[in-house]
């Protein structure tokens, strides 16, 4: 997981070695093998940066535009802009999906003794009568798992986990 997370943020062999407390050569080997094993990731990164440099923007899967005006800068600013350009379509698509689910949710739960309270990243928190938890989970799961549709038919299904508790921490 260190590799998947660090990859999006452009970690170097030096940075990975420092984080894992291993020799730099070994860390660079991890990075090289990672990109050999998952060549599509490098391709995505390269294509996204190229597009951002040519257009000063990137887009989410839903076509929402995220501007990247610093992408052609020099020095550390360019590195930050490059990492942001790579990450923005991924996090932006996740934000688009949760937003679409939130827009659909009030209608979906209108007849239930439940209220959507807040959103935190990719989670929605509800207040619900205890005897309605099961039916609410079914409705919420359906709304969230199909939130990308009909605009997108995803190749990988969205899977929703649910928890319950007297408070947010307990629900995890």
Where are these regions (language model features)?
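Conserved catalytic core of nucleotide polymerization and phosphodiester-bond processing enzymes
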Residues: 1-2, 6-172
């Amino acid at each position: 997981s260190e590799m998947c997370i660090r990859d999006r943020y452009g970690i170097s062999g030096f940075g990975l070695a420092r984080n894992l407390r291993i020799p730099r050569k070994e860390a660079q080997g991890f990075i090289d093998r990672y990109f050999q094993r998952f060549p599509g990731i490098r391709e995505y990164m390269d294509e996204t940066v190229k597009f951002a440099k040519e257009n000063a923007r990137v887009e989410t899967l839903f076509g929402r535009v995220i501007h990247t005006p610093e992408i052609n800068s020099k020095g550390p600013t360019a590195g930050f802009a490059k990492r942001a350009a790579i990450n923005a379509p991924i996090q932006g698509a996740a934000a688009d999906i949760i937003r679409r689910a939130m827009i659909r949710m009030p209608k979906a739960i209108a007849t239930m003794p439940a209220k959507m309270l807040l959103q935190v990243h990719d989670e929605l928190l509800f207040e619900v009568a205890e005897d309605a938890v099961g039916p609410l989970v079914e409705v919420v799961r359906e709304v969230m798992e199909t939130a990308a549709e009909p605009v997108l038919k995803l190749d990988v299904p969205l899977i929703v986990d649910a928890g319950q508790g007297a408070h947010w921490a307990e629900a995890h």
